[in-house]
């Protein structure tokens, strides 16, 4: 009986060891920068502190689209009318709107590549989200002093050709635009506690809202991965606690006379809108 017990416990011990080894073999490491095959939409707004509609219905519409599409949308706001609006990043804003076919007034809303009225915003977002993604990216952004250092990977999901660009934007939230705001920040027709959000402050490429080519190649294969690293220089006057980074992949329009010279492909960030 004792020999039988010893045999049983010995077998049990080997079984446990064998199970543990099996678990070790199954352990894998996931790349934190591996892009997901997920399509997101893009909303770009042109706005200003000097615009009453921007501070009322424009503000409400922008926030509603963010909230209703949280986790599905890249949302940025370019301010204009410098020097009356102190948040006008003139060169970036000008490069953005000069390659878009927009209207004559503000606010202006662009979903993907199209300038749209409010009633068309959600249907256009829904349409983009149904696309089969060409490519996607993922990144980390870590601040060191006045530099935001970015490490990213771009992944293609189709065999495709073209000139692809990438933009990283440093945006700021919770900028006081209410009754106690300073010159150039107080929002016309805004509430006493008004906050400017998603304000584009800078990008990794000076004076170009569409960034730069992340590869010299013009043909890409399914599952091809490309690494891209860069930095954005921040202004010490900004509140670094409220800065976040968002990114967009663009494709250069081969038709040089087209009103939209950079076509939205996809984008990524970690923002959650409530």
Where are these regions (language model features)?
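Feature marks short, surface-exposed loop/turn motifs that line or immediately flank catalytic pockets
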Residues: 19-23, 50, 174
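Secreted/luminal cysteine- and crosslink-motif detector
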Residues: 20, 52-55, 90
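Local sequence-structure signature of Cys/Sec-based thiol-disulfide redox active-site neighborhoods
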Residues: 32-78
């Amino acid at each position: 009986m004792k020999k039988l017990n010893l045999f049983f416990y010995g077998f049990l011990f080997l079984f446990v060891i064998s199970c543990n080894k099996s678990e070790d073999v199954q352990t894998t490491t996931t790349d934190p920068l591996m892009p997901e095959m997920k399509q997101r939409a893009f909303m770009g707004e042109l706005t200003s502190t000097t615009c009453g509609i921007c501070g009322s219905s424009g503000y409400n519409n922008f926030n509603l689209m963010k909230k209703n599409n949280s986790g599905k949308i890249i949302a940025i706001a370019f301010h204009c009318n410098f020097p009356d609006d102190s948040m006008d990043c003139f060169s970036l804003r000008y490069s953005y709107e000069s390659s878009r076919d927009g209207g004559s007034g503000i606010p202006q809303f662009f979903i993907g590549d199209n300038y749209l009225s409010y009633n068309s915003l959600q249907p256009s977002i829904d349409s983009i989200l149904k696309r089969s993604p060409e490519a996607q990216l993922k990144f980390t952004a870590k601040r060191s002093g006045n530099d935001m250092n970015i490490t990213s990977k771009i992944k293609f999901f189709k065999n495709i050709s073209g000139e692809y660009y990438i933009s990283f934007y440093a945006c700021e939230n919770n900028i006081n635009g209410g009754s106690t705001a300073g010159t150039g920040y107080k929002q016309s027709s805004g509430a006493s506690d008004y906050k400017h959000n998603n304000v584009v402050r800078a990008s990794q490429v000076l004076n170009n809202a569409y960034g730069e080519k992340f590869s010299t190649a013009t043909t890409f294969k399914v599952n091809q991965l490309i690494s891209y690293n860069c930095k954005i220089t921040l202004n010490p006057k900004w509140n670094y606690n409220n800065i976040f980074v968002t990114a967009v992949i663009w494709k250069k329009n081969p038709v040089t006379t087209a009103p939209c010279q950079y076509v939205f492909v996809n984008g990524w960030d970690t923002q959650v809108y409530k």
